[in-house]
Amino acid sequence: YINRAFQYAYDGHNGQNRKSGEPYITHPLHVAIYLCELNFDKETIAAALLHDLIEDTDISYEDLKKEFGEEVADIVDGVTKLDKIKYSSNEEAKADAIRKMVIAMSKDIRVLILKLADRLHNIQTIEYHQDWKQEKIANETLYVYAPLAHRLGFQSIKHVLEDKSFKILHANQDKEIKDMITETNPDRDSQIESAIDIIKTLLNDNSMSAEVYGRPKHNYSIYKKIVNQGLTFNEINDLIGIRIVTDDVKNCYTILGLIHANFQPVLGRFKDFISMPKFNLYQSLHTTVLTSDGTKMEIQIRTHDMHYRACLLYTSPSPRDRG
């Protein structure tokens, strides 16, 4: 089935090339590979291979429906309709674009996921476009697709979309941040892995059930914190971040005690948003501690329900809401 979809797409795009000069089929193939890595069903993979045929060739919805069934044809048609949304540079239009895509999502969420994968590959090969086109794509990506990726739970995709867009729109600031990271904290990834191992061992030794995640703060998030909160680079406390998600509120406070007993807390950096939620109902415990080499590390502790709500709150009006 998927092989047949590939051959159909290959034939349909025959003679077409990307801006890079590569055969056009390389694009839908990359999109399909992304979705394979996410373990999507064969219909979604087939739709990924076929997703540009209606827009860029003489092949119609009815042709796809006849060859691959209504389900695949509907997904491709949904992606084609999203491509026709006109974007503007003002915030209201961007918000309206998001609402239109959410409406499309209510019919079949796979349309949006495929579109995210499509945008992920396009932003990674954007250098072949003219500068004005790169800026247009980067703006769309930063204000529409990256928040959408977050809403759908695809954090790694969100970070790539944000950082690639940020590099295009704010190249100088992006380089400054990269240089500062290299100078002050070049071993972040290994520090995070070490911290996760230590915390997991600590929780296991104390029979605490929890999931532990770690991530380096990516460049666009650093930039937002500097701009929105008026911080200097050295004042940012979560260049290394750990999130602990557990079953109930009691566990949150027990884990906090274990963290403070085994790491040195940074004075003035503990915030209890569980007992005193933010006005948008965000809840979590935030603390900043020092690793063995003196590196600051922010730790967030929350329940699964709190984590779910936090994800939904991502696009709240004020950038300060997320602390």
Model-derived regions: residue spans:
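Nucleic-acid processing machinery
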Residues: Y1, Y10-R18, I25-E37, A46, ...
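Alpha-helical scaffolds flanking conserved acidic
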Residues: D41-L50, E71, I75, V111, ...
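Amphipathic alpha-helical interaction segments
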Residues: K42, D56-T57, D83
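DG-centered beta-turn motif at the end of beta-strands
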Residues: H51-D52, D118
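Transcription initiation cofactors for RNA polymerase, centered on bacterial
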Residues: L53, I75, V79-K84, K94, ...
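Hydrophobic or amphipathic alpha-helical targeting/insertion segments
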Residues: D63, E67-G78
